[in-house]
Amino acid sequence: MRIVVLAGGIGGARFLRGLRQAAPDADITVIGNTGDDIHLFGLKVCPDLDTVMYTLGGGINEEQGWGRADETFHLKEELAAYGVGPEWFGLGDRDFATHIVRTQMITAGFPLSAVTEALCDRWKPGVRLIPMTDDRVETHVAVELDGERKAVHFQEYWVRLRASVPAEAVVPVGAEQAKPAPGVLEAIGEADVILFPPSNPVVSIGTILAVPGIREAIADAGVPVVGLSPIVGDAPVRGMADKVLAAVGVESTAAAVAEHYGSGLLDGWLVDTVDADAVTRVRAAGVLCRAVPLMMTDLDATAQMAREALTLAEEVREA
């Protein structure tokens, strides 16, 4: 079975770990979000790609869900001693090495997709990880700070500001001009099932879908497209997805996120058991829906979520 998964960072990576256990013989291709990418200290940092790579490769800081295990921060301390920032973005020493290698390869002329493949040679994530595009795309958020409306990089909004001010707009800058990375459209066209994990529907999966050609390829693939709600009990499972959902006019509910994706894209939708009342509304929107436990409390629970998604995909296929 060939499975394509659109993935952001922590939520997507943890779901993928469960999917690997649930479908050990499947050929899994992950299309990773690069809208979170940021240039810091002259280096290209790809937080979501690295979170997937580290999580599946056994190098992630399990407690926080991002960054490396057994990390040290000597380089960050030295930069701070020179007065060089930003201090709010915590790159560790081991993590810096990844960004140095990536930036060296890109400077030498390699596209991000080839660089990601080379980095995965070390981590052996057990999936094929492809960035959504080799072109530069960075998500910016329009906010009002000190009475002034301005645009900040998504990382600044998420990490420094902790989404403490309302997001007035979310824009994946560069997405309209971007092209899908080599292998993206081919993987979608050859897939038996396409999954949207419980990643952020606006700044993770939404950004991937903003690259021209990707949404259309998924809609035209002719295979089940199944998503899992990142909203449980009208609140994000983790992170601050409600803040960016509000910016695009979507209420923070499991049903509203399904409607946001739309029946033209989505065939099946899993909601948590606490949101069982949403099933009727989602089905009325033309999307097959079931309520199952959606909390990724451990690997077994996550693997069961993945099995439920694949089961729903079969129901879609037979409908």
Swiss-Prot record:
SUPFAM superfamilies: CofD-like (SSF142338). GO terms for biological process: F420-0 metabolic process. Its EC number is 2.7.8.28. Keywords: Magnesium, Transferase. GO terms for molecular function: LPPG:FO 2-phospho-L-lactate transferase activity; magnesium ion binding. It catalyses: enolpyruvoyl-2-diphospho-5'-guanosine + 7,8-didemethyl-8-hydroxy-5-deazariboflavin = dehydro coenzyme F420-0 + GMP + H(+). Pathway: Cofactor biosynthesis; coenzyme F420 biosynthesis. It comes from the Bacteria. 7,8-didemethyl-8-hydroxy-5-deazariboflavin binds at residue 50. Gene3D superfamilies: CofD-like domain (1.10.8.240), CofD-like domains (3.40.50.10680). Its cofactor is Mg(2+). Belongs to the CofD family. Homodimer. Catalyzes the transfer of the phosphoenolpyruvate moiety from enoylpyruvoyl-2-diphospho-5'-guanosine (EPPG) to 7,8-didemethyl-8-hydroxy-5-deazariboflavin (FO) with the formation of dehydro coenzyme F420-0 and GMP. This is Phosphoenolpyruvate transferase. The lineage of its organism: Bacteria, Bacillati, Actinomycetota, Actinomycetes, Kitasatosporales. The gene is fbiA.
